[in-house]
């Protein structure tokens, strides 16, 4: 057997890729495609992004060639190994299976921004991406949230200044700016360490849960803060830009009252930097949120979860500006009158949380239908517990049933016991 002398490694040219596009080894040929200083300016580069499946074929060979031909200087400082994109079941995409998703079709149906954000959010280190319509729909809803926030802000104020151009004075503005500071710090850190999925998750949580679900709802009790919230949202869009460049540019200029042709793209603006936190405002609104959540829970007990009630009492474990807090609690908890007290209120529905207690007076509420409903729930749970105990105490059942079935029944018993304890406590609070 004789080795063929006319064989070139398939990956040989790829191994030179870190240098050859910069003019290395071309001996002056095709000089119109590169500048004389390209090799000096761009070698070594800062980052290579690639799939882990070609690490040996391509990445390792580039490192060896780069080191060999450039006096020991490696071609990249960092290498980011991204996941492989699979179908929604986790199977590798292939034409023979018919499960290939054409990116152009996806862009047409969902938009490039939604696809970018979805892939970033799902790019968990060490795990392949399972991509399907369900994922894309989730992040379509996120873009709807961005549009809805913009529309709400402009229902109240036509245009907004940038955050650096205003002084944030309202309590709500100070609070949301402080929460933005936390998001900025965390997103900068995760981007710098290539944890793009964490960056996307933090951004998603801030926009959806903090700014929209709480900040915008709070602003309905404090219209003066909306101009500040608009500036904070514009700063947020700068963090959205790397993931969703088209939507973020559009909404930023819409809020500014400008067009992209008249101003700069977010892509060339400075990414948000360190913002000073306001812990006093954060602590204040943490208690306000806790009070609202506790009142909502208490209202569910009396079947008035989404209805407005006349009065509620709140007993705090710490001191806050109660007059400032009242409008937010009244608006979001749907309570006409709030009274802060120092002692427990008798004859009331009580909800106890970490830092406060809330009381709903029962004097004007017909409690009998509620007591009847809870009593029936208790009776049903008692029968369920009796049935599960009977099965789990049956030696024959335990010996023959699969372990998964036994574990499922044990969990069901634990859940039923927790529920009956809660129902019994509620009945006791009614002296029933």
Residue ranges with predicted function:
Residues 19, 57, 116-117, 209, ...:
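Feature representing long, continuous alpha-helical segments
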Residues 20-22, 97, 116-120, 248-255, ...:
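Short hydrophobic alpha-helical segments that form membrane-spanning helices or hydrophobic packing faces
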Residues 38-39, 46-54, 106, 221-227, ...:
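Short, contiguous acidic/charged loop-to-helix segments that flank catalytic cores in large enzymes
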Residues 78-85, 123, 132-139, 162-170, ...:
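A glycine-rich phosphate-binding loop feature that marks nucleotide/adenosyl-phosphate handling sites
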Residues 137, 255-432:
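C-terminal low-complexity, glycine/proline- and small-hydrophobic-enriched intrinsically disordered tails
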Residues 87, 120, 160-188, 213-293:
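Acidic, turn-prone loop/beta-hairpin segments
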Residues 3, 72-78, 115, 129-130, ...:
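Acidic/polar loop patches that form or flank catalytic/metal-binding clefts of enzymes
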Residues 1-158, 176-221, 227-240:
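Structured secondary-structure scaffolds
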């Amino acid at each position: 057997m004789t080795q063929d002398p006319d064989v070139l490694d398939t990956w040989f040219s790829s191994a030179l890729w870190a240098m050859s596009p910069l003019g290395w080894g071309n001996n002056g040929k095709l000089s119109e495609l590169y500048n004389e200083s390209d090799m000096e300016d761009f070698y070594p580069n800062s980052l290579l992004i690639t799939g882990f499946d070609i690490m040996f074929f391509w990445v390792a060979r580039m490192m060896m060639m780069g080191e060999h031909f450039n006096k020991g200087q490696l071609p990249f400082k960092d290498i980011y190994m991204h996941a492989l994109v699979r179908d929604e079941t986790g199977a590798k995409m292939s034409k023979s299976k018919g499960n290939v998703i054409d990116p152009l079709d996806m862009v047409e149906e969902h938009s490039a921004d939604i696809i970018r954000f979805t892939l970033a959010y799902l790019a968990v280190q060490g795990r392949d991406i399972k991509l399907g319509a369900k994922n894309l729909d989730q992040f379509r809803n996120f873009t709807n949230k961005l549009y809805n926030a913009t529309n709400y802000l402009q229902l109240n104020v036509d245009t907004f200044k940038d955050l650096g151009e205003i002084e944030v004075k309202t309590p709500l503005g100070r609070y949301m700016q402080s929460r933005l500071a936390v998001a900025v710090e965390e997103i900068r850190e995760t981007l710098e360490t290539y944890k793009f999925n964490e960056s996307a998750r933090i951004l998603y949580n801030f926009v959806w849960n903090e700014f929209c679900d709480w900040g915008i709802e709070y602003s309905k009790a404090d219209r003066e803060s909306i101009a500040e919230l608009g500036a904070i949202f514009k700063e947020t869009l700068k963090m959205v830009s790397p993931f969703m460049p088209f939507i973020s540019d559009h909404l930023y200029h819409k809020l500014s009252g400008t067009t992209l042709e008249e101003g700069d793209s977010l892509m060339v603006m400075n990414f948000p930097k360190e913002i000073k936190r306001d812990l006093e405002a954060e602590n204040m609104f943490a208690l306000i949120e806790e009070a609202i959540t506790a009142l909502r829970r208490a209202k569910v007990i009396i079947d008035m979860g989404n209805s407005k009630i006349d009065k509620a009492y709140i007993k705090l474990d710490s001191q806050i500006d109660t007059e400032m807090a009242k409008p937010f609690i009244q608006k979001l908890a749907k309570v006409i009158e709030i009274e802060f007290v120092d002692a427990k209120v008798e004859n009331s529905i009580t909800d106890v949380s970490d830092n406060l207690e809330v009381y709903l007076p029962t004097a004007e509420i017909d409690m009998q239908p509620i007591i009847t409903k809870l009593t029936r729930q208790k009776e049903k749970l008692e029968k369920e517990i009796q049935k599960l105990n009977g099965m789990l105490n049956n030696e024959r059942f335990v010996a023959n049933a699969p372990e998964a079935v036994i574990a499922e029944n044990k969990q069901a018993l634990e859940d039923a016991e927790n529920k009956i304890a809660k129902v019994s406590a509620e009945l006791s609070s009614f002296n029933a």
